[in-house]
């Protein structure tokens, strides 16, 4: 059975707290796992969340500030220690290549796994295209070079049993119609409907910019930083971050179905205020104020 869910490993921003670890998010997408922004302590959080090194197929780092990347050293060494049986691909800003190398080879260990380096440069663009999804990136606005990521499942078609019966199509003929697009004068479009592929977006440290909206547009799930509350918007702009209200307005204007707020400044004690401000900004879809070690299902597909 396919599983599509977000496993939240950490939700703090620059400074971890007693209740919030540095960043870390594993997206389970059917049989594949994509680890985003492994901050300090990610390896232990994986253990607590029931995530194994074998679950990781791809690593995506938005930028090289410590709360988003210090966990790379431990995670990479654990992947090799456990002799993960498949290659792992790492995406990260090309401008931070020297940081990646330092973290990859922070200490001595035996390399047993193929780790493919696929850095992101320029405006971003398509990073990977598989039968299951396309992975894109877009440049964000932060004091150091930062990229967000977007995963898009290909659109497919859903066969409609009533229309198949109406045209007398059954058994092996259904497969032939799906393969060839036409059968006995009946086209695939006549007996099916488009099923839109699911879309997932991951947006960390950034001010509002075109890249934020490009990544968020039409997402079934948007995981987005909301470091500050609205009353501290000036701080957010100065330091290259978003407020809860700004993140929620992006989600509202982009047609996001499920908004996941995370990356909270340690200055705030009550996470419910982030939800209050997000609702006040007009977002009325599913909303999760992330906590460490929770699992958030990707919304089920909906038909047009």
Curated annotation (Swiss-Prot):
Residues reported to bind Zn(2+) 2: 67-68, 205, 263
Swiss-Prot/TrEMBL catalytic activity: Endonucleolytic cleavage of RNA, removing extra 3' nucleotides from tRNA precursor, generating 3' termini of tRNAs. A 3'-hydroxy group is left at the tRNA terminus and a 5'-phosphoryl group is left at the trailer molecule
Active-site residues annotated for this sequence: 67 (proton acceptor)
Membrane spanning stretches: none
Cofactor note: Binds 2 Zn(2+) ions.
One Pfam family in the UniProt entry: Lactamase_B_2
Residues binding Zn(2+) 1, per UniProt: 63, 65, 142, 205
Domain of life of the source: Bacteria
Statement: the UniProt record of this protein carries the keyword Cell division: no
MF term (GO), any: zinc ion binding
InterPro entries, per database record: Metallo-B-lactamas, RibonucZ/Hydroxyglut_hydro, RNase_Z/BN
EC number, UniProt record: 3.1.26.11
Cofactor(s) the protein requires to work: Zn(2+)
Record keywords: Endonuclease, Hydrolase, Metal-binding, Nuclease, tRNA processing, Zinc
Gene3D superfamilies per UniProt: Ribonuclease Z/Hydroxyacylglutathione hydrolase-like (3.60.15.10)
Family: Belongs to the RNase Z family.
Function comment: Zinc phosphodiesterase, which displays some tRNA 3'-processing endonuclease activity. Probably involved in tRNA maturation, by removing a 3'-trailer from precursor tRNA.
Subunit and partners: Homodimer.
PANTHER family (alphabetical): ZINC PHOSPHODIESTERASE ELAC PROTEIN 1 (PTHR46018:SF2)
Protein name: Ribonuclease Z
Naturally occurring in which organism (per UniProt): Streptomyces griseus subsp. griseus (strain JCM 4626 / CBS 651.72 / NBRC 13350 / KCC S-0626 / ISP 5235)
